[in-house]
Structure formats: structure tokens, C-alpha cells
UniProtKB/Swiss-Prot annotation:
Pfam (any one): DUF1328
UniProt membrane topology term: Multi-pass membrane protein
Family: Belongs to the UPF0391 family.
Lineage, broadest ranks: Bacteria, Pseudomonadati, Pseudomonadota, Gammaproteobacteria, Oceanospirillales
This protein's GO CC annotations: plasma membrane
Main location as per UniProt: membrane
Organism encoding this protein: Hahella chejuensis (strain KCTC 2396)
Protein name stated in the entry: UPF0391 membrane protein HCH_04387
Subcellular location: Cell membrane
Keywords: Cell membrane, Membrane, Transmembrane, Transmembrane helix
Residue ranges the record marks as coiled coil: none
Residue ranges crossing the lipid bilayer per the database entry: 6-26, 30-50
């Protein structure tokens, strides 16, 4: 039980450091950009798969 309390304490410290510094804002911007890129790639793959099935 002591082990898990120490693990959660360390996780809370890391989350606090990332949350209270500017690192969180920078990573959020990167995550938004990556989300849009992968969303576009997903839509393209669905459209390309639809065209491929129509040929068979």
C-alpha cells in the first residue's frame, strides 16, 4: 500500500510540474496540430478505401 501511495505521489508531482509551467501549453498546441493531421489522413484513407471497393 505504501508503494502505491508513493507512485501516485510521484505522478501527482509530475502532473503538477507540467500543469503549472508553460510545458502544458506547448504540448497542447502540438497535440492539436497532430490531431488535425491524423484526422485529415483518416478521412483520406476512408475515401480512398471507398473508391477501391467500387472497382471490385
Amino acid at each position: 500500500m505504501l508503494y502505491w501511495s508513493i507512485v501516485f505521489f510521484v505522478v501527482a508531482l509530475v502532473a503538477g510540474v507540467l500543469g503549472f509551467t508553460g510545458i502544458a501549453a506547448a504540448t497542447a498546441d502540438i497535440a492539436q496540430i497532430l490531431f488535425v493531421i491524423f484526422l485529415v489522413l483518416f478521412v483520406i484513407s476512408i475515401i480512398a478505401g471507398g473508391f477501391r471497393r467500387n472497382r471490385l
